């Protein structure tokens, strides 16, 4: 029935690696990574990066995630590298798809999400909640692909 959703990671484990990419790696991708880490536990590896990373994570995104009991304050924005894409099974872009290197055999998705930069907490909560719903769907797909 076609190819599997995920290629098994060829490293030491068979847990899939998911890379979240947004322009600044300060809001959307950090929230998505935080949710997947919290919900997947050791069932997956999570990376995040940005094509033009900021110096720090958006404080309103940190606040919105803290309301969910998820601490993303200890992270820091990272530059997107070819290696990060190559080492991932699933690449989720959020507004920067063209900046992401393409490797055959990867699963790519582009999530159209509003940028939380400059937004108030109410707006960021809405973005956060949309990300959570998408993460729950992604996680169910990843877990069913491993069976």
Description of each model-found segment:
Residues 4-147:
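Short polar/charged helix/loop
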